[in-house]
Amino acid sequence: SVYSDRRTNRGFESMAFNTDDNLLYAFIQSPMRPEGYLDGNAEIIRVLAVDPYTGTPQAEYLHLLPSADISAKNAGVDKVGDAVYDPHRGVFLISWRDSSDGDTTATKRVVEVDLLGATNVLDTDWQTILCLTQPEAYATDSLVDDMAAEDIYFTNRVELFNLPSLGAHLGFDKMTEGLAL
């Protein structure tokens, strides 16, 4: 399983139950670094939908973290803190964070994630599509376009706010460890 090829101490950081499809969605904390990964490759968070009664995976989606070279406001985003499902709007709210503390440039964002239009990649043969074992080993600058050419799409996201920019206390790095509706 690709999940055994993750960074040490980087498991499923958050889970959210989707009351619309009755699946439990698990968000891996940090981008995985499978064999072939190079610095500068895509920062992908995997989202696994599991039947909570049987533990059987039902779907898997790819969530692309913003790259530090795309936007300075997203520099350092490397972790998912928590997730919650909003049944009224059919979206997930997740927190992104970096490891900074005590700095107004710290990134502690809350982001809305929508699976509408995202491709279920569970059991995808990446070797056939990308000539690689996993999409994480693909170059960041062309991954999204090349996958779209194969009709594979990432989750959609809307950045809602960054806690430090709202005046939140900056004394610790894990201020977005919990979300609730």
Where are these regions (language model features)?
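Sequence/structural signature of beta-propeller domains
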Residues: 1-181
